Curated annotation (Swiss-Prot):
Superkingdom per UniProt: Viruses
Its job: Not yet known.
Family: Belongs to the adenoviridae E3A-2 family.
Cited InterPro entries: Adeno_E3A (IPR007912)
Name the UniProt record assigns to this protein: Early E3A 12.1 kDa protein
Organism listed in the record: Human adenovirus A serotype 12 (HAdV-12)
Pfam families: Adeno_E3A
Length: 105
C-alpha cells in the first residue's frame, strides 16, 4: 500500500467528515501499515496518526479574582487502530473510526 493510497483515503474522509475536530484537517502524520504474522501484534493491519507536540493556552476569567492564563504543553500523541480481519487493506471505515477516537483526545 503506497502513501498515495493513504493520502487519497484521508482526502475522501475529509470530504464527508462532520466531526468538530478531524485528523484530516489537523496537522498530523497519517500512515497505513501491515504487520506480519511473526510480529508480536501480528498478523494485523491498520492506520496510525501522530499528532505533533503542541501547546494549548486559554484564559480563565470567570469565578476568579483575576484573569489566569493556563498553558498545557503536550508531547507527541500516537493513535493506532489495528484490524485483525483476514483481508489486509485500507478499509473505508478506518478513517471514520480513527477520527472518532481523535475527537476523544
Amino acid at each position: 500500500m503506497s502513501n498515495g493510497a493513504a493520502d487519497r483515503a484521508r482526502l475522501r474522509h475529509l470530504d464527508h467528515c462532520r466531526q468538530p475536530h478531524c485528523f484530516a484537517r489537523d496537522i498530523c502524520v497519517f500512515t497505513y501499515f501491515e504487520l506480519p504474522e511473526e510480529h508480536p501484534q501480528g498478523p494485523a493491519h491498520g492506520v496510525r496518526i501522530t499528532v505533533e507536540k503542541g501547546i494549548d493556552t486559554h484564559l480563565i476569567k470567570f469565578f476568579t479574582k483575576r484573569p489566569l492564563l493556563v498553558e498545557k504543553d503536550q508531547g507527541n500523541t500516537i493513535l493506532t487502530l489495528y484490524c485483525i480481519c483476514p483481508v489486509p487493506g485500507l478499509h473505508e471505515d478506518f478513517c471514520c473510526h480513527l477520527c472518532a477516537e481523535f475527537n476523544h483526545l
